[in-house]
Amino acid sequence: MDIKTLKGFKDYLPKDSLIRIHIVRQIFSVLNSYNFDLIDTPVLEYSELLLKKSGDEAEKQIYRFKDNGGRDVSMRFDLTVPFARFIATNASNLKFPFRRSQFGKVFRGENSQKGRYREFMQFDFDIVGEDSFRGDAEILSVVYYGLEEIFLNFIEGINKKFIIHYSHLGILNSFFEKLGIKEKSLFILRNIDKIDKIGVDKVKEALLLKIEKEVVDSILNLVNLQGTFKEKIQALKSILGDNESVKRVEDVFQHLSLLKIQDSFNLNLKISRGLDYYTGIVFESEVFDSNMGSVCSGGRYDNLVSSFSSSIQKISGVGGSFGVDRIKDIIDLEKFSYVKIFVTKARSKVLIVNLDSALQDYYYELATRFRNHDYSKVKNISCEVYFKNKNGKNIKEQIEYALSKEIRFLVFVGQEEYKENKMKVRDLTKKEELLLSFEESINVIKCSEKLLCTPF
């Protein structure tokens, strides 16, 4: 009897399992600070659902079989498509925008190697029901703080630097349309996504099978755009003119600059992702000197949820996925003698009420200050800004949103409070409201903490 594990599958000894669960814990800490809610979905789904938006490459890797009842079923290859099905199934029971987090195993029948397995753990996070550059930037900031928490604050002696590459499929599709090859966009995107894996020469060879050389050269020149962020944007504007997707990327970068984390991001038009459901911003993250590929990837998907049911209107979403096992493999490359053990503290939830269009940037700066007020320890204040949309939301609806998420504290900042560098803090439990400075508000919120059970 052959008792070894299948190729691409592995056992985890106690030390390995400890590292994995601490990676999950660190990611959970960051996601919880943004008020993401934890969910779960089945490992098995109907094949028709998973294949609907998987794309040709993913379809080849799906574990598919007939169950004992003769049903055509498949093991999930990611957590995003099952999540879209989850939204379509449970939309009436959810409050939007919905912030989801989920960790679990996924399965892909691909060539296994270091950092790439057939069974592996992912930790996903999404914001659904919100289509704005703020939502895109919020997800990218989660990537940054998640990687910072893992590689700077997790293992004693590990100080891994990382870069987050991002792009926008709207920019590429606009360029393809200008070249008159819009109908070949999916074919081109799938090949562009392989440049860093197989090299530009092989990608060029594949593109030349269906596209003229002059056009292929134009495409490759665009995706290899060099320079600073400002120089790249200027070049794109000179090529595409007044373009909505270019403006979106500018706005996202401005938000990241607001948080002072923009230097860890790189506008890289080679990033296109290999899955058919992405429609907007896309990203991958790279840890220097690891040679492991992306450790956190994702993007915006505008049509995925509605594709599961004709009765569901368009629900836009944006999200990402941390590769837990790939991150563990990078940690294994290091020599370390001590794993920091963090105690997950009770969380105090805060919602910044969106009152004034002129104070949007300030609200997000304030949310970051709440989350990071005691950054040397595990985060213990969860905070989010209620998204401002075109129709506007009155205070009553924002309070109902807070109550539905069991958020205890509301923060109100209008022009008067902003000028005085104060805020109104309303405790929904005690039903009292105080005018406080930031430090005073921290004390009020922290003093009200109670022990809280967490999954870890």
From Swiss-Prot:
Please name one Pfam family that this protein belongs to: tRNA-synt_His
Q: What class of enzyme is it?
A: ligase
Q: Which GO terms describe its cellular component?
A: cytoplasm
Q: Which PROSITE patterns match?
A: AA_TRNA_LIGASE_II
Listed under subunit, the entry gives:
Homodimer.
Note the HAMAP family from the entry.
His_tRNA_synth (MF_00127)
Write down what this protein is called: Histidine--tRNA ligase
**Source organism of this protein record:** Borreliella afzelii (strain PKo)
